[in-house]
Every structure is written in structure tokens, then in C-alpha cells.
Amino acid sequence: MKTLLILTILAMAITIATANMQADPSGQVQWPQQQPFLQPHQPFSQQPQQIFPQPQQTFPHQPQQQFPQPQQPQQQFLQPRQPFPQQPQQPYPQQPQQPFPQTQQPQQPFPQSKQPQQPFPQPQQPQQSFPQQQPSLIQQSLQQQLNPCKNFLLQQCKPVSLVSSLWSIILPPSDCQVMRQQCCQQLAQIPQQLQCAAIHSVVHSIIMQQEQQEQLQGVQILVPLSQQQQVGQGILVQGQGIIQPQQPAQLEVIRSLVLQTLPTMCNVYVPPYCSTIRAPFASIVASIGGQ
């Protein structure tokens, strides 16, 4: 049966081919030439159509798989974020907060260190002895240094005109000039802040010399108020007679004359308050030293 079918198909094909040849004898040469040209069109259309979709499959598959893969390291970046908030947050609040309240303990010795402040007022005690010792030492040194001034004032030397009872010896002008130069030289060597006290020391020396002379002569003398008893208008000195009220005025005259004579004679500046001081010598030195 198969062979019959094959033979019939071949016979039909032969008959069709012969019929076409007979219908167009000029196209016998062209038809067989046109059929092979149709055959290469098929492979060209088939081959590029199969090649072009193939790279389209590779490009989306390969990069699409690789690009989502680097998303994995993004998970790693998220992981280190966890240790950073965990590590610094725990040590910083725990460690510094504990030592700082502990360092508050050394604040206790500071109030304890106030104790050595006590010895500072203690050395003030020897300062109290200075006003007791210094005036006497200064007075003695000034009196010795200005002894020429006292001798000059006690002599009858012009232009000095002290009370006549204090004059001891009348000297010639040449001797008075020498004593005057010695007095001014010694007074110029004394610091300016002590010149007022030096002049008062001369006054004090003159008064003390007068008291010694009056004691030897058995006449009226000056004594401290603690040993005096007032009787009427005079002052009774036990066993030594009565001092008349006019004698303190006489001593005030001596004071004013000395304070006016020495600065003018030796050309020494003395503050105005120096002539108004009526306090004892120790108070004068203390007041001048504080200025």
C-alpha cells in the first residue's frame, strides 16, 4: 500500500512538473533559478532571529543576577551599626560618672587646710613689740645723731632766741657756725619720713636736760602725771615742791621754737602736721611710720 501511495505521489509530481514546463517554456530556466534564492532567505531570517534573542536573554540574566547580589554587603554595613551604639553608650556613662563623684572626696581636705591660716595671725604678736622697742631705739639713735643740734640750741647763738634759762654758755660766732653746719649735716642724713620725729627728739632731749638740771638744783621739775597730785592751782610733787602752771606753757614755747628754727636753718622740709603734734615720742614714731 505504501509503495502504491509513493508511486502515485511521484506520478502526480511528475505530471505537475511537466504541465508547468509546457505552459511556459521560457520560464523553465527561471523557475528553478528562483527557487534556490528563496532558500537562502530562510536561513538568513532564521539565523539572525535566533541569535539576537539569545544575547537578549544573556544580558538581562547576567547583570540582573549580579546587581542584586551586591545588595548582600549592604547587610554587612547595617551590622556594624549595632556595635557602635552598643559600645560607646555603655562605657561613657558608666566610667566617667563613677570617678567624678569619687573625686569630690578631696574637697574635704580644703576646709582642713584652713587650719594653717591660724599661724598667720600668730606672727602678728611680735609686731606688737616693735612699737615698744622701736621708738626707744629710734629716739636714742636720733638723739645721738642730732646731739649737735641740741648743743647748738642750748647755746646763745644767733638767730636762735630760746628761753634765757636754757642758755648755758655764750659761744663766739665761729663756734656757732661750726655747730650749725654739723647739725644741718646730721639732719640731712635722716630719712624724710623720720625728720619730724628727729626734730621732736631734739625737743625731748632739751626738756629732759632741763629736768636733770632742775633736779640737781632742787627747783621745780616735770614728772609723770601718775606721780602728781594737784593742790589748788599748782601741782604738788612729793618732797620736791610745787610746779607753777606757767612752766608747761614755757615748755610749749621751747617746742615751737625748735620746730620753727631747725627746718628753716637747715632748709629741711617738714610737713605741716609736725608742728601740731603734742603726743609722746613713741606715738609720733608710730604715726609717722604708718604714713
From Swiss-Prot:
Q: Which residues cross the membrane?
A: none
User: What GO molecular function terms would the record report?
Assistant: nutrient reservoir activity
Q: Where is the composition biased (Pro residues)?
A: 82-99
Q: Which InterPro entries match?
A: Bifun_inhib/LTP/seed_sf, Bifunc_inhib/LTP/seed_store, Glia_glutenin
* Keyword field: Repeat, Seed storage protein, Signal, Storage protein
Q: Pfam families recorded for this chain?
A: Gliadin
Biased composition regions of type Low complexity, renumbered to the chain = 38-81, 100-117, 125-137
From the UniProt entry, list the residue stretches annotated as the region Disordered.
38-137
Q: Which SUPFAM superfamilies match?
A: Bifunctional inhibitor/lipid-transfer protein/seed storage 2S albumin
**Protein origin, superkingdom:** Eukaryota
Q: What residue stretch is flagged as signal peptide?
A: 1-19
What family does the database annotate? Belongs to the gliadin/glutenin family.
- Other observations noted: The gamma-gliadins can be divided into 3 homology classes. Sequence divergence between the classes is due to single-base substitutions and to duplications or deletions within or near direct repeats.
Described function: Gliadin is the major seed storage protein in wheat.
Q: What is this protein called?
A: Gamma-gliadin B
Which species is the source of this protein?
A: Triticum aestivum
